[in-house]
């Protein structure tokens, strides 16, 4: 083998990289175990322990525990539990604001029509709007709509329609970016470990958010869907406010000493970072960690009695700026509780508002201290004197000293009020507040007129960029609405972990046994070693990408292992052929690797093509599956073709392993000299296939498919009851209350206690409270089959599994459903086209392409037909959803592997025996590759059966589709693709001979 040195170096470097990234997972698990041991079952204390070490350097003196947790392999929502949502910024609302909410009839009608068409069209709202407006108002320029004050520097009366459309796209993109920045900030404050938020570039206005471990979905819904609220406030100085805080501390001493504390008010006097919780365990925890003695702990308790507020709030009595105090983030909630008491509020000025800074104090190396700002409310209505809707633009730049700064422009009204505000506060600070948190409080040097300002300070470039984003978010014209949602409870996630691990282990063991049984112990173990390396490298690469491992991802990894065996099977089968030809082991093995390379390369590349299409058209779990599948295939190519070759070359260079036969007693002569007449009955095979396709089409046309909410829109609720229930009983209960809405109920699992309820009830309605109202309505409807002590709070608690509760839920809005349906069709069509083109390029004969695409189309129709025939009869769900489309594409990728290997042998035989009859040549090609075809199919079926039986309900339908794909894909390679290619070549040759005879 050439380039052995490069392969060795690459393998060593890849191993080191994978060890490095995987090591973070071991570090975090070590400290998680210590936290569990310390907490002794108290979840809160366990979390406090981990939080106390979050900014401590725990790994090689360079990485904090927080950084290690960010670098570890994260678990997806279906394994860890949590919430996945897709939010959509209303593009029509943005356009309305940009047009200054014009009442023009043509404008409003065009916009309404565009919004309606966007749910089914592949064109975006802007394209549809422009088209409709030109229909309704022929010759009317767009500039007359958008030459507004807000767009005065971008659109004039002389702007062309193309220029206006470009500006609209830029403004909509900016609005989505603003929403993205607001959501990112809100999520960071929520304290979620390893959140994932990304703007879906191919879908205008949509943002995907994944929040592992979330236990309060209703709170998250409100957090994500709220409008951004940017405000500019006047401020107090710390020196002015300190006396009031001293009075509050004195008042609290009496309250805390009292046996009946004053009733706590529900106030927003100071909003804490959401990660903070009212707890007094932080101090005792710190003492335990630092080894403080009981006397010190007792002294601290006495101080907290005498100075309840100042024991946890460090004041800044002589400060000239608006920062009045500092506190550890663990204490902020308790401080809020104190400051919100009516008795304490009575000690404060009526115009004083205390708000926390959004970021930790910059001089705290542990990043655990937050600043408390004193805001002055000077308006009679209690609102801010200036709000973010007046900000026209903001950008980060550098001042004339070369330091990071932020420039900001306001509209005419904002410029006038800004001039007045800055004039009244020269020498003082103005706080920039978003969603109740202070982002910056720059000092006013002089009156600012004209509406253009520059904010300077000790900014880093990143901080300047963040502040510019905050200022831009103030003009967010429309809030984001949830159009798709998945919520998975933690125990359901644990069940998925157990099922995934079990299916993976069993599949790996059976594959290892199979390889040793078919090719002998040493060759089998070499192939098995490649599988283990494949697993190690795949996990390492996933960890380096900070990709989340999902159940679909595990399925992709397991399937990649099954497909990885294909390369070893090809190499070993070719080696056996060379041995039968009388070659020595060294020469036979070298030729086996060389002759198998093109087939391995082509089959892997076609699978990667389908994986890329799957990644581009899928979201969430489907992308996770595609990611692990692509990585697994790439790694399997490296390990099977190069790593195993290094092993054999090393030992054979020392004249060892020269007695290998690459077979066992079972497989020694298995299909070695078969001579099936495949081509002799090609018309029979094609007739049978055609009949099967017609039957499947008939079922699809009459019975149809069971479409999931991915394609119809709606909500799924997976509900677990205390006792066994009948799905029909649940369906009747819900149908009686949900009116004309579609309702379906199916059993999940075998214990009869879990059902999945699907309905499109009120799915087209929008609003922050719709989801909560439907959950409450579902609770009232199911009360007769719930235990008597179950409350609404218990019923919607994903962690509760006693008495009956929702353990997971899913929502897909109508616009998302239409997009998924269109994307699914395009993904399958593009996969067939891409594979057809690739086969044409590689094999230089259209007969191969037509044969392959025709066979793949038959595979797809027959799988769809099987689902149409079987749904309602099988003891598991056969709904058509995104996962099913993933299975179809994966089956296409797998099926083409067989066809590529067979056509590769046909091409090889054409070169070796150019005068041999095509009929015999095709038969010989099919017979010589039959062992490989059957071995690969069996090894892949072993994996799929493990997933199907042990992988859990969530992945069973996927495995079933893949099993059908492997079976029909194997048959179509032998009885559809090859006969069609043969007949096309035969007809072409006959045509050429006819032309020659003329």
Which role fits each region the language model picked out?
Residues 8, 12, 533, 538-541, ...:
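Hydrophobic alpha-helical transmembrane segments of membrane transport and translocation systems
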């Amino acid at each position: 083998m050439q380039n052995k040195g490069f392969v060795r170096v690459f393998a060593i470097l890849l191993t080191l990289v994978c060890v490095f990234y995987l090591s973070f997972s071991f570090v975090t698990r070590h400290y998680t175990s210590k936290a569990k041991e310390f907490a002794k079952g108290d979840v809160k204390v366990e979390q406090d322990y981990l939080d106390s070490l979050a900014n401590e350097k725990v790994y090689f003196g360079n990485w904090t525990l927080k950084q290690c947790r960010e670098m570890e392999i994260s678990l997806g929502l279906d394994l860890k539990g949590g919430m996945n949502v897709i939010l959509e910024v209303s593009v029509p609302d943005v356009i309305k604001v940009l047009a200054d909410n014009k009442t023009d009839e043509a404008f409003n009608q065009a916009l309404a029509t565009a919004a309606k068409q966007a749910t089914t069209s592949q064109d975006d709202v802007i394209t549809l709007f422009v088209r409709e407006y030109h229909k309704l108002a022929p010759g009317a320029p767009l500039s007359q709509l958008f030459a507004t004050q807000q767009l005065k520097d971008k659109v004039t009366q002389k702007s062309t329609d193309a220029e206006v459309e470009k500006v609209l796209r830029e403004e909509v993109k900016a609005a989505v970016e603003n929403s993205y920045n607001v959501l990112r900030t809100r999520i960071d404050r929520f304290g979620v470990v390893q959140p994932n938020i990304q703007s879906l570039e191919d879908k205008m206005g949509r943002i995907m958010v994944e929040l592992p471990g979330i236990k309060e979905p209703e709170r998250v819904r409100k957090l994500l869907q709220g409008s951004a609220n940017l405000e500019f406030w006047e401020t107090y100085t710390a020196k002015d406010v300190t006396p009031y805080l001293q009075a509050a501390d004195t008042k609290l001493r009496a309250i805390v000493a009292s046996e009946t504390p004053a009733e706590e008010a529900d106030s927003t006097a100071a909003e804490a970072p959401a990660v903070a919780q009212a707890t007094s365990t932080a101090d005792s925890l710190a003492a335990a960690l630092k080894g403080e003695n009981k006397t010190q702990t007792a002294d601290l308790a006495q101080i907290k009695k005498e100075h309840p507020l100042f024991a946890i709030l460090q004041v800044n009595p002589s400060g000239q700026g608006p920062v009045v105090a500092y506190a550890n983030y663990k204490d902020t909630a308790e401080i809020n509780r104190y400051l919100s008491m009516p008795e304490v509020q009575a000690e404060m000025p009526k115009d004083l508002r205390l708000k926390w800074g959004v970021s930790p104090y910059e001089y705290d190396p542990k990043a655990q201290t937050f600043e408390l700002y004193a805001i002055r409310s000077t308006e009679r209505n209690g609102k801010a004197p200036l709000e973010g809707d007046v900000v026209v633009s903001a950008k980060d730049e550098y001042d004339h000293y070369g330091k990071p700064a932020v420039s900001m422009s306001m509209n005419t009204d904002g410029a006038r009020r800004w001039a007045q505000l800055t004039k009244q506060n020269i020498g003082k600070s103005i706080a920039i507040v978003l969603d109740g948190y202070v982002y910056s409080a720059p000092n006013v040097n002089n009156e600012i007129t004209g509406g253009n300002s520059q904010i300077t300070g000790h900014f880093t470039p990143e901080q300047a960029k963040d502040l510019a984003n905050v200022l831009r978010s103030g003009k967010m014209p429309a809030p984001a609405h949830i159009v798709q949602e998945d919520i998975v409870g933690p125990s359901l996630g644990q069940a998925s972990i157990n099922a995934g691990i079990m299916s993976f282990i069993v599949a790996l063991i059976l594959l290892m046994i199979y390889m040793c049984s078919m090719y002998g112990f040493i060759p089998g173990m070499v192939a098995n070693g490649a599988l283990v390396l494949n697993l190690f490298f795949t996990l390492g690469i996933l960890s380096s990408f900070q990709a989340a491992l999902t159940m679909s991802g595990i399925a992709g990894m397991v399937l990649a292992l099954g497909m990885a065996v294909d390369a070893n099977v090809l190499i070993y089968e070719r080696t056996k052929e060379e041995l039968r030809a009388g070659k020595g082991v060294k020469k036979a093995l070298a030729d086996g690797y060389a002759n198998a390379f093109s087939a391995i390369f082509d089959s892997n590349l076609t699978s990667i093509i389908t994986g890329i299409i799957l990644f581009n058209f899928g979201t969430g779990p489907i992308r996770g599956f595609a990611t692990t599948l692509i990585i697994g295939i790439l790694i399997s190519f490296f390990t099977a073709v190069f790593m195993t070759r290094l092993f054999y070359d090393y030992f054979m260079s020392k004249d060892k392993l020269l007695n290998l036969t690459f077979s066992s007693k079972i497989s020694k002569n298995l299909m070695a000299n078969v001579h099936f007449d495949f081509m002799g009955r090609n018309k029979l095979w094609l007739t049978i296939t055609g009949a099967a396709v017609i039957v499947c089409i008939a079922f699809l046309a009459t019975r149809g498919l069971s479409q999931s909410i991915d394609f119809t829109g709606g909500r799924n609720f997976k509900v677990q009851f205390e006792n066994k229930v009948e799905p029909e009983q649940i369906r009747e209960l819900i149908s009686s209350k949900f009116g004309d809405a579609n309702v379906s109920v199916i059993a999940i699992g075998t214990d009869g206690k879990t059902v999945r309820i699907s309905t499109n009830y009120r799915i087209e309605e929008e609003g922050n409270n719709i989801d909560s109202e439907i959950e409450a309505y579902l609770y009232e409807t199911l009360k007769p089959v719930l235990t008597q002590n179950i409350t609404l709070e218990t019923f919607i608690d994903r962690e509760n599994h006693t008495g009956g509760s929702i353990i997971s839920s899913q929502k897909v809005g109508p616009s998302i459903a239409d997009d998924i349906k269109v994307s699914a069709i395009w993904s399958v069509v593009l996969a067939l086209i891409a594979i057809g083109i690739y086969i044409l390029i590689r094999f230089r004969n259209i007969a191969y392409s037509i044969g392959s695409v025709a066979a793949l189309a038959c595979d797809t129709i027959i799988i769809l037909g099987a689902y149409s025939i079987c749904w309602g009869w099988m003891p598991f769900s056969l709904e058509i959803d995104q996962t099913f489309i993933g299975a179809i594409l994966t089956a296409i990728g797998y099926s083409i592997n067989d066809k590529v290997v067979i056509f590769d042998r046909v091409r090889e035989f054409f070169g070796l025996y150019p005068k041999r009859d095509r009929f015999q040549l095709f038969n010989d090609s099919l017979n010589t590759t039959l062992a490989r075809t059957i071995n690969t199919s069996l090894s892949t079926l072993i994996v799929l059966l493990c997933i199907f039986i042990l992988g859990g309900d969530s992945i069973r339908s996927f495995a079933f589709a893949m099993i059908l794909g492997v079976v029909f894909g194997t048959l179509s390679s032998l009885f559809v693709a090859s006969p069609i290619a043969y007949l096309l070549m035969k007809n072409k040759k006959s045509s050429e001979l006819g032309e020659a005879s003329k």
